[in-house]
Each structure stands twice: as structure tokens, then as C-alpha cells.
Regions:
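Membrane-embedded alpha-helical segments that form the functional core of polytopic membrane enzymes
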Residues: 1, 53, 77
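Cytosolic/stromal cytosol-facing helical appendages immediately following the last transmembrane segment
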Residues: 5, 14-25, 46, 62-161
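Hydrophobic alpha-helical transmembrane segments
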Residues: 32, 52-54, 105
Length: 161
């Protein structure tokens, strides 16, 4: 994980209860940068507006789905597509799962990069940041990354420091 980006993405990870709306809880800088990595290539490669609109809808639906608290057994599909169980491990406070499950759509990407973590039936026990002083409230969280060292808002994962 990138320490500069983490200071903004920490807003998304500050939630202690992951639910369907959590996919929309983001810092504005995080939105700008991450969306740019998707949208600019679509534009440069000349995809039509219709393709872009379909992509945006798919990404929005996937974000909602990945953050829901449904414990549906996805069977073999959980190895093909990001599921709530897979993504909840990305939000876990468990030190062994930090820097895991970065994929947005396809878990095989994490398999390739060695960041895949999906216990058979287990779900994380706790989510959120270790830093209890991380601010609550939308405006405070939008301002916080500009005036605080990212080390102060990281999970306990030493690789981010």
C-alpha cells in the first residue's frame, strides 16, 4: 500500500461496521485518483460513452455488493468474483490480513500478486482502524489527511509506515 494514498483511503477504512453504503464512504482525493486510473484509460483507448456508462454502473453495483453483509454461499463464484466475504477481509483489523484483497472485481488479481486471503468459511471479527483518535464526521475526515502524518491513521500493519 502507498503511504500517501493511505492517508486518504483511511477514511474508507475508518468504519467499524462494513455495510452496503460503506463503498461510498471515501475521501474526495481518493475518489479523484482511483477513478482516474479507470476512466482515463477508457477515454484514451477510445471507448464510447455507452461503454463508459455501463462500466460506471457495474463498478457502482460491485461496490455495493462487496460491502454488504450478506452471508450467501457463493460456491465457486467466490473464486471468480469479489464477494462480501472476500472484501470484508480487506477491511479486517487482523494484522495478518493487512495488505490483502485489493482486487475490486476479480480475486485472481490478488492471487497473481500474492495478496489473496480467503479462509474457507471465516469472516473477520473486527474492522476499522487501530487509531481510535481518527476523526468522526464527514468534514473532519475530509480535512484530516492534509494535516496529519499517514502513520497516525494506519492500521497496525508495519509495511505502511
Amino acid at each position: 500500500a502507498n503511504p500517501f494514498m493511505w492517508r486518504f483511503h483511511a477514511v474508507h477504512h475508518s468504519i467499524q461496521y462494513v455495510d452496503w453504503i460503506a463503498g461510498s464512504r471515501l475521501h474526495l482525493v481518493d475518489i479523484l485518483i482511483t477513478r482516474s486510473f479507470s476512466y482515463i484509460p477508457l477515454f484514451i483507448l477510445g471507448f464510447s460513452n455507452d461503454v463508459f456508462y455501463v462500466y460506471v454502473v457495474i463498478v457502482a453495483l460491485q461496490a455495493v455488493m462487496a460491502h454488504t453483509n450478506v452471508r450467501i454461499p457463493f460456491s465457486f463464484l467466490k473464486y471468480l468474483f469479489v464477494t462480501p466475504q472476500f472484501h470484508h477481509w480487506h477491511h479486517s483489523k487482523d494484522k495478518e490480513t493487512h495488505d490483502k484483497n485489493f482486487a475490486i472485481h476479480f480475486p485472481f488479481i490478488d492471487k497473481i500478486f500474492g495478496t489473496y486471503h480467503l479462509p474457507t468459511e471465516d469472516w473477520p471479527e473486527e474492522m476499522g482502524l487501530e487509531d481510535e483518535s481518527f476523526p468522526k464526521g464527514y468534514l473532519k475526515q475530509q480535512i484530516y489527511p492534509f494535516f496529519n502524518d499517514p502513520k497516525n491513521s494506519t492500521p497496525t500493519n508495519q509495511s505502511l509506515r
